[in-house]
Amino acid sequence: MTRIKPPALPENATIAVVAPATAPQTRSDLEQAVDYFESRGHEVRLGKNLRKVHGYLAGTDAERAEDLQWALSEPGIDMVHAYTGGYGTARLYKLIDWDAVGDPRIVCGYSDLTALHLALAKHANWVTFYGPNILRFTRRKDDYPLTSETEDWFHRAFKPQPLGRVFEDPENPYVLTVGSGAGEGPLVGGCLTLLASSIGTPYEFDAEGCVLMVEDLNTDPYLVDTAINHLILAGKLDGVKGFVFGTDVNLKDQTIPEEPQSNLSIEEMLDELIGPLGIPAIANVPVGHGKHMATMPLGAQVRVDGDAKTLEVLEAGVA
């Protein structure tokens, strides 16, 4: 089924900022991000519970759900932008009135926000955007600065023109061929941990006829192996048109615990698990956690070419 595209982002957009997962880290971070978008002529509206904290969450489930319901349903909102990822978005599934979701609007976020992308694909059939959370739009100099590549791709993603070929990571430009050939289809995917945990729930993803994109952060290689093998055994790579693995970000020591001489690189693991599937597949593409991030329209048509080592967005994600 063809996804519904939200309208392109207007010059003077109304942007709702919510935190379905982890709480804002500091007030200054939030203020810097708001200033960034206001300086570009946009109106930024904050969820009323945005600054609340409940353990590692941005408020209770009810408080986070209230903000998310408002952002998805309130008339006049052009874009819903997640503050950050973390944990807890999937806890809101049963608290949102999906029938009350309003007109299509841009929804952007990544990492734990994979859960929201899956829910909106199921209940609203929208094209949504796996892209930087609003926390990235600060002057922070940590692992996730706002690079020119990330910034340019982000703003182009919400215009009614195809994005074209995804840029190479300027600091690690090598893209690995895992499977040869080329394939096209709607883009499906997100954070590997969230995709794997969706299996067996009403929100599990369907990648048949699609290009599957996965990425993750701070994960032991053997756990990446486990998660990808789980997808394969669950049939989630049956009938896919292509496979994309993001950049390896902050991978932990590539050894099995208590067996320091045992190791298997991510490249070797992908060759062993994905290679035999005979599908076009590439790895080390900047589509998630990492210093440079390409905003990707989930549900839009893309093309992956294993021999050319490219991922190309063939159509605009907005109308």
Briefly describe each language-model feature range:
Residues 1-76:
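ATP/NTP phosphate-donor binding region
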Residues 24-29, 182-216:
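Conserved beta-alpha junction segments in alpha/beta enzyme cores
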Residues 76, 101-106, 124-126, 240-241, ...:
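A short helix->loop->beta-strand "cap" motif at the edges of active sites that frequently abuts
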Residues 79-89, 110:
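N-terminal glycine-rich "phosphate-gripper" loop used for MgATP/nucleotide binding
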Residues 98-120, 127-134:
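Short, acidic/small-residue loops that bind anionic groups at enzyme active sites
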Residues 125-193:
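Conserved anion/nucleotide-ligand pocket segment
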Residues 203-265:
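Internal helical hairpin/lid segments
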Residues 245-319:
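ATP/nucleoside-binding phosphotransfer catalytic cores, i.e., glycine-rich phosphate-binding loops
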